[in-house]
Design a protein with these regions (language model features):
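Compositionally biased terminal segments of proteins
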Residues: 1-169
Length: 169
């Protein structure tokens, strides 16, 4: 689980409304996920910002990161799958592969559900922060450990030097 629900699991449920459910999957597992969702309507953001049907058995190119899922054409989107690369035993950031961490540190568990670590999710939100992303950062900041703050600070300095969140970290 990723996105706002991952932040809620860390900072407290019910802090704000959510528009969708974000689920991270490894790009290498995309065809298995597609088979599991047989009967659902799947659309790839290809090119980004444009949705097109994801054809059965089609391996999406590395530039495609998002898949939108709904039951059928008349239904609203139920959730978004986010494709991510994976290194051997490590999380590899799809936005910048220099950003890596042991896989066990990139995921945390609550009530049997795996969630993207808050420092990683906040890094993704930092690219073009909306009001809700700024709120997520403010809600998480006092709860982040020194190691989590350090990861987020280093990732932001590397990819978004001068980011406004750096001063708070």
């Amino acid at each position: 689980m990723a996105g706002g629900y991952a932040i809620d699991a860390f900072a407290g449920a019910g802090r704000r409304e959510h528009e969708d459910i974000d689920i991270g999957v490894f790009a290498a597992d995309q065809l298995a996920v597609q088979a599991h969702l047989s009967g659902w309507e799947l659309h790839a953001a290809d090119p980004p910002g444009t949705l097109r049907p994801w054809r059965e058995g089609e391996t999406l190119p590395p530039a495609v990161h998002d898949i939108w899922v709904r039951r059928d054409h008349g239904d609203s989107w139920r959730f978004q799958l986010m494709l991510n690369p994976k290194g051997p035993g490590e999380f590899v950031c799809r936005r910048d592969e220099r950003i890596r961490m042991p896989f066990g540190d990139a995921i945390w568990w609550r009530d049997g559900v795996p969630y993207l670590a808050p420092e990683v999710q906040l890094f993704f939100k930092a690219k073009a922060p909306r009001a809700k992303d700024k709120q997520d950062f403010a809600d998480c900041l006092p709860l982040l450990s020194a190691a989590q703050r350090g990861f987020l600070r280093e990732a932001l300095e590397l990819v978004h030097p001068g980011h406004p969140w750096l001063g708070a970290l």
